[in-house]
Amino acid sequence: MILPIVAYGHPTLKAIAQPITPDYPELEALLQDMWETLAHSEGVGLAAPQVNKSIRLFIVDGNPFYPDYPDAKDFKQAFINAELLETFGEEVPFKEGCLSLPNIYEEVMRPDKIRIKYLDEHFQPHEEVFEGIRARIIQHEYDHLEGHVLSDHVAPLRKTLLQSKLRAISEGKCDVDYRMIFPHKKRHR
């Protein structure tokens, strides 16, 4: 089932997500729905808070970045209860987008290497180093677990310039090809 994505301004996006256990209700169905939602929305990552679930879960699929970024090929996995242990390497700029902030693309500086600890969808533990576009995608999705969104990474002046667009998104005044929940959309009577 394709899930609606919550838009900028929704309180779930600002909350720190909670860890889950293997007995989390309907986890397998949620993961399946998130994969379907990600494919439908043509994104490269989706965090549970973006589908209004304040839990520490995100999925990534780097394939849309291939062939421009060869290491994105076949990078498709789930991260549960992830803990970002270290960021290192060079700070690299990249124009990022976010399904919760449709049609906004902003340059974000991020380290090009990370070390992360997480559980896979079978709750098997992993600790890995990722770099390049893989590290970028993971950091973006991890931000959602910590209550951060794309606009939190832009310079204050740029964020001020974006305010009218962000307000419009929260009110549902944007063109988007996937279902969304708009926190400040006015209902017609």
What are these regions (language model features)?
Residues 1-139, 144-189:
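Active-site rim/adjacent substrate-binding subdomains
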